[in-house]
């Protein structure tokens, strides 16, 4: 099993953690329906780039 030989400093720990932050999802508003959805994803009502691509699910 791997065991470190020397203790990592606070600086090295911080450098490693600098990439762990989460970013907010990029949201768009559909031009035809006004539905808010994630960019480059189909909106919940089945539209993508102004065209109906799939049938909307009934919930």
Swiss-Prot record:
One of its GO terms (biological process) is translation. This is Large ribosomal subunit protein bL32. HAMAP family: Ribosomal_bL32. Belongs to the bacterial ribosomal protein bL32 family. GO terms for cellular component: large ribosomal subunit. It comes from Marinobacter nauticus (strain ATCC 700491 / DSM 11845 / VT8). The gene is rpmF. Residues 21-33 have a biased composition (Low complexity). Keywords: Ribonucleoprotein, Ribosomal protein. InterPro entries: Ribosomal_bL32, Ribosomal_bL32_bact, Ribosomal_zn-bd.
């Amino acid at each position: 099993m791997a065991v470190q030989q020397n203790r990592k400093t606070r600086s090295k720990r911080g450098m490693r953690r600098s990439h762990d932050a989460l970013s907010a999802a990029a949201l768009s508003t559909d031009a035809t329906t006004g539905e808010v959805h994630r960019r480059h994803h189909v909106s919940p009502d089945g539209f993508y780039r102004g065209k109906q691509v799939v049938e909307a699910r009934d919930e």
